[in-house]
């Protein structure tokens, strides 16, 4: 059976301690995988079966394994073969690095190797490398993280396990009123109070930025179009940089006095334009709309 037939993708992440398993797990979570850390091998098949019967709630399961004994390794190998026989076709990722780099990483965090015991750090690394040699030889993808930064490792994992949708930047465009305080979760904040306030237009006061009357008024003001064009150009630059650095969630906040007129109209228009840009998924939030 293929992935289409089983309805679920399965990945197994293993490798040497200090080679980047935690980073890989976080990246897979960001890509939409359901990640389980250190699940006993005998329970992996059950976990996958539950995911397959979740009616689409879980479509991608990744199991991150911290292998510490020979029996554990052999059990994992058997489970992978069993999953393959059932048609799940698990993709095995193995992470490694040179002894010198692994030693340096352990020394930086001042931790011992899980197999070190009373011996030297290098002995623990050697024991683990030997213990995992068979699993490494059977892996679908081996990544040497010796010379990779965190961002470079994430990029390689995205290439191997991501989809077009999961690697796109998710942008939240939020309107707010300064009278109610700045949004704490905003990455970028812009002040829209340079535009005339529709509040002072009696026939517009009771409307808001979602209404056509207010929208046309705000977008028709001198400077509104220039602001949108220039801000969108800035976001292309900033968004590309954030994407290279592995940032997949971006919150843009536009504020006016009460968060009812100017910021709402501009947020809706900006979101519409950004939605047309390749690589961005956009949603709008009007934090203070409806507040007195």
UniProtKB/Swiss-Prot annotation:
Pfam families: PapZ_C, RapZ-like_N. InterPro entries: P-loop_NTPase, RapZ-like, RapZ-like_N, RapZ_C. Disulfide bonds: none annotated. The keyword GTP-binding applies. ATP binds at residues 15-22. Displays ATPase and GTPase activities. This is Nucleotide-binding protein SACE_2139. It comes from Saccharopolyspora erythraea (strain ATCC 11635 / DSM 40517 / JCM 4748 / NBRC 13426 / NCIMB 8594 / NRRL 2338).
């Amino acid at each position: 059976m293929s992935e289409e037939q089983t309805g679920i993708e399965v990945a197994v992440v293993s490798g040497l301690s200090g080679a980047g398993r935690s980073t890989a797990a976080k990246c897979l979570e960001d890509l939409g995988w359901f990640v389980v850390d250190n699940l006993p091998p005998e329970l992996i098949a059950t976990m996958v079966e539950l995911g397959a019967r979740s009616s689409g709630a879980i479509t991608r399961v990744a199991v991150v394994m911290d292998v510490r004994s020979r029996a554990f390794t052999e059990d994992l190998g058997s489970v992978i073969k069993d999953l393959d026989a059932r048609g799940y076709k698990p993709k095995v990722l193995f992470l490694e690095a040179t002894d010198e780099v692994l030693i340096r990483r352990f020394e930086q965090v001042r931790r011992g190797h899980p197999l070190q015991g009373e011996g030297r750090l290098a002995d623990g690394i050697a024991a683990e490398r030997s213990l995992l040699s068979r699993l490494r030889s059977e892996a679908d993808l081996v990544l040497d993280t010796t010379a990779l930064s965190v961002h470079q490792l994430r990029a390689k994992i995205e290439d191997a396990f991501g989809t077009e949708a999961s690697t796109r930047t998710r942008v939240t465009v939020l309107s707010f009123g300064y009278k109610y305080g700045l949004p704490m979760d905003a990455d970028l904040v812009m002040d829209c109070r340079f535009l005339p306030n529709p509040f002072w237009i009696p026939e517009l006061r009771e409307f808001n930025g979602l209404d056509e009357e207010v929208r046309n008024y705000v977008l028709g003001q001198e400077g509104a179009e220039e602001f949108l064009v220039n801000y969108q150009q800035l976001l292309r630059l900033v968004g590309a940089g954030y994407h290279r650095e592995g940032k997949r969630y971006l919150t843009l906040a536009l504020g006016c006095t009460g968060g009812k007129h100017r910021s709402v109209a501009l947020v809706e228009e900006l979101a519409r334009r950004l939605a047309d840009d390749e690589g961005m998924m956009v949603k709008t939030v009007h934090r203070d709309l409806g507040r007195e």
